[in-house]
Structures are given as C-alpha cells and as structure tokens.
Amino acid sequence: VPDLYDDMLNTFSPKKNAAFEFCEAVYFLAYKDDKVVGRIAGIINHRANETWQKKEVRFGWIDFLDDIEISRALLDAVSEWGKSKGMDTIQGPLGFTDFDAEGMLIEGFDQLSTMATIYNYPYYPQHMEKLGFEKDADWVEYKIYVPDAIPDKHKRISDLIQRKFNLKIKKYTSGKKIAAEYGQAIFELMNEAYAPLYGFSALSQGQIDQYIKMYLPIVDLRMVTL
C-alpha cells in the first residue's frame, strides 16, 4: 500500500511538520546512468537523543534497486552527514517520530502490508547485513480475528472492572467534538503510554495541535471508544 503523495511532502516540509521544532533532516537521491535508483532521508531527532542519551542519526524512507553499491552510497551519505553534525551512530529505518513508519520487513513478504507499516523486498535486509548493520529491535505484527460473540468470561471480567473502577464508555457522533473535549488529553496519554517505546520522543504541543487538526475530525467514529 503506497503512501499518499501529499502526506509524504508534508512530512518532509519544515513548514508543515511540527517535528522540525526539534528535528533536522536531509534528503538524498542515488543516480545511475541518469536514472534515479535509490532514495533516503537522514534525520536527527534531538529530543529523542536527549531522552535516550545518544548521538544518533536516523535513516528513513530508504528505497533502492538490488545493487549493493546503491544501498552503500545512500547509507554512507547519511552517515557522513550525521558525523558532520556530531553524531556517532546510525540507526533505522526510523522517521521523525513514532507516528511515521518504522523498521524493515524481514519476514511475511507474502502478506499484504498496511499504510501504517513498511513494505520492502527481501533483498533489503540482506543488503543491511552485508553493510555491517545488526538488528537492534523487533516489531511484531499480529492478525487478530474478532469472534462473532464476546466470550462469557471476557464479558464477566469487563463488567467487573467497570464496576470496580467506576468506568464508563462514551461514544461520539462528531470527530470535532472529540477533538474539542478530549483531543489534548488523548495525546498527553499517548505521550505517557509510548514513553518506554524504542526511540520514542514526546510530542510537543505543536505536534499535538497538528495531529488533533489532522486526524480527529476525520476518524471513523465506529472505531473510537473513550
């Protein structure tokens, strides 16, 4: 599933992406015989580096033909840029934040990818290994089948927890109302819940405002419960 073109342009634009409050980036294309044969983004997330006490340059949005010289040239370009900025380690694929697609597919190439994940050909991780990169973390995707009826045990546990903690379920008919009443709280909760995740950096107020405006008014309310 390819990215939406306008979304990608907005992500790469300092005028459109609030992550540039604490990130800087550079973009490279690889050419061979006057044809584009690869691309890569280099990113320094200063907030993440401060949080995790590291000096890392990230690479993301990497694509290349099956030619080791192309992949080497792309990654060398980001490495050299990172060194010029005082970084001592390169990691990726990562984006500006955890809301960008991350990681590299190493199995499940026969499965349909989603817009929230990265698809790449099997030769991609092979190139990374040949270039001396090592896996540092695993992201695992699961397919969960929802039963036609809620199991009685799950229903009893749900009822018990709701009574014990006085929990109530709220459903909305307006994305704008969710944004107005709970938008700030939703993303503050995400900052707290996502804090232990690999390479996470807390969303700034500018990013929270941006995501509230981008996503909450258009969410599928059938999928949202508070």
What is each residue range found by the language model?
Residues 11-16, 23-28, 43-45, 73-78, ...:
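Short alpha-helical segments and helix-capping/turn motifs at coil-helix boundaries
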Residues 43, 77, 81, 189-193, ...:
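Generic, well-ordered alpha-helical scaffold segments in large soluble proteins
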Residues 14-29, 213-225:
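A short helix-loop-beta-strand connector motif used in the catalytic cores of GNAT acetyltransferases and
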Residues 51-137:
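Acyl-donor binding region in acyl/amide transferases
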Residues 29, 35-45, 226:
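Conserved beta-strand in the GNAT
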Residues 118-199, 223:
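Acyltransferase donor/substrate-recognition loop-hinge adjacent to the catalytic core
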